[in-house]
Amino acid sequence: SLAGRNLTYDTWHYHHQNLDFIDLAQAIPECTMILDHFGTPLGVGTYRNYRDEIFQEWRTEMRQLAKCPNVYVKLGGLAMPDNGFGWHKADRPPSSDEFVAAQKKYYLHMIECFGPERCMFESNFPVDRLSISYPVLWNAFKKLTADFSADEKQALFYGTAERVYALTD
């Protein structure tokens, strides 16, 4: 098993698969699992006109997932085209302020549910570069956490990833 080998399980899936992931996390509590890209709340195709409904459903599912102490979350990937913000088609990419205005509610909800000690920022590059530049994305993360404590910022920008992935000796 992954847990027996001190390995983690990362998953990237779409919002309509969140309940299956919750079942998996509950079934194998000894395995450390990482949810990538927020469980991607889709905003394209048949989902493009349901952003508010999907957000409400997603919020409820993330609260439920946060009850699984073996689950951590990577906060990033919302700039990719799948989420339906349309930045990859725009005349110019969003500024960090525009990014924060559009996506703050997703980030803050995850941090509220899981706590900074179970969240880590991630860039999802090179895919995100279709919509946003690397420096602008990380500046947006800094703006999102402007009112956070030094310990909370340390967890989000480095500490959680260091601990979960055993990046130190």
Which positions does each model-derived feature cover?
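Catalytic pocket-lining loop regions of alpha/beta-barrel enzymes
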Residues: 1-120, 131
